[in-house]
């Protein structure tokens, strides 16, 4: 065990205004969707720019255990689809995309496929997806609607109509849509919950299906997918815009400038909302064909916003709000209690520990800026909590992030990129 693992990671303090260009790795959301679609396709797929991180490594390991061929050619992966076969044991880690997307795909396999993961993964919601898959004809064994789960595969999924309460996670809908083209009959998915969070992630799923020749109809709340082949070909993964959040926040915190090359002009990624959100908080955001440049202003403004569509951005936005000129209110994010940790409780606890004034409400956070001081910032094994501590450390001396290694879930190179930004 290293000294950093024992004592925590001293978050570096910026010596002045940050002025940096940060090249980000590929999108986790796009990478794992692309891997599942490639595994279910009618022909091989080349994936370029895919993210190499724990979540994607777990996805590839799971697909390989089901018989899918994945050759690593350095700058791309060549995925050779195959009939999925058990028996297999899938380690989901803490990856929601693995425990939901791959579980749905396993209903097409022959034989038994078991799923389990990290202790926290056993607490993450899964029952609505299991119920919906059963409505489509899948056979599953579970205890209490959470991991561990065993899929008893017959080699096909009958299809038909299902309803799902996706209030806890839009990944339930995406999982059903991803497997739907391989069902025996058309699949209709209806959302019956009170709210539907993270809609851009469903939009991404639909767009990626259509790009591969799948016929998908419907809008938020109801979707219909026709059975048919999924095309292969070449897929280019965009940079991970949500993982850009802490780096772009550095521009606001230090009054500096950060540029992210290859930011897409049009995208379905939820992280693209950073352009509007950071502008509202006082930044200047300039997008052109080569990338996005964010320049911080003299102060950070508080933010009053419904963030249900972009909840993965909330930890970074909370750090900015703690340093702002007026209180902030974040709404529509009650589902964050079921993320890698209860992020609402965790953010309230850690910001308060450093001298902040934060209240976790039923569906959000109220953050009242106060003078902050150094101290240990606990990550709760959550990559976005860890990067939040790094943002605060830019201007609050003495912050030590516990378990910075958890960033390996989606960005193993975070510390290298972060320290490089400050050189």
From Swiss-Prot:
Q: Which InterPro entries match?
A: Enolpyruvate_Tfrase_dom (IPR001986), Enolpyruvate_Tfrase_sf (IPR036968), EPSP_synthase (IPR006264), EPSP_synthase_CS (IPR023193), RNA3'P_cycl/enolpyr_Trfase_a/b (IPR013792)
Q: Which keywords appear in this protein's UniProt record, sorted alphabetically?
A: Amino-acid biosynthesis, Aromatic amino acid biosynthesis, Cytoplasm, Transferase
Pathway participation? Metabolic intermediate biosynthesis; chorismate biosynthesis; chorismate from D-erythrose 4-phosphate and phosphoenolpyruvate: step 6/7
- In Pfam terms, one family for this protein is EPSP_synthase
User: What would be one Gene Ontology cellular-component term for the protein?
Assistant: cytoplasm
| Top EC class of this enzyme | transferase
Enzyme Commission code: 2.5.1.19
| Residues binding phosphoenolpyruvate, per UniProt | 28, 96, 124, 171, 343, 384, 409
- Residues annotated as binding 3-phosphoshikimate: 28-29, 33, 169-171, 198, 312, 339
PROSITE patterns linked to this entry: EPSP_SYNTHASE_1, EPSP_SYNTHASE_2
Active site, renumbered: 312 (proton acceptor)
Q: Identify a single GO molecular function assigned to this protein.
A: 3-phosphoshikimate 1-carboxyvinyltransferase activity
Do you know which Gene3D superfamilies this protein is assigned to?
Enolpyruvate transferase domain
Q: Which reaction does it catalyse?
A: 3-phosphoshikimate + phosphoenolpyruvate = 5-O-(1-carboxyvinyl)-3-phosphoshikimate + phosphate
The listed locations are:
Cytoplasm
Per the annotation, which location comes first and is thus the protein's main one? cytoplasm
Q: Which GO terms describe its biological process?
A: amino acid biosynthetic process; aromatic amino acid family biosynthetic process; chorismate biosynthetic process
Give the function comment from the record: Catalyzes the transfer of the enolpyruvyl moiety of phosphoenolpyruvate (PEP) to the 5-hydroxyl of shikimate-3-phosphate (S3P) to produce enolpyruvyl shikimate-3-phosphate and inorganic phosphate.
State whether it acts alone or in a complex, and with which partners, per the record. Monomer.
Family assignment? Belongs to the EPSP synthase family.
Task: Quote the NCBIfam families the UniProt record gives.
Answer: aroA
Tell me the protein's name: 3-phosphoshikimate 1-carboxyvinyltransferase
Organism (species): Acidothermus cellulolyticus (strain ATCC 43068 / DSM 8971 / 11B)
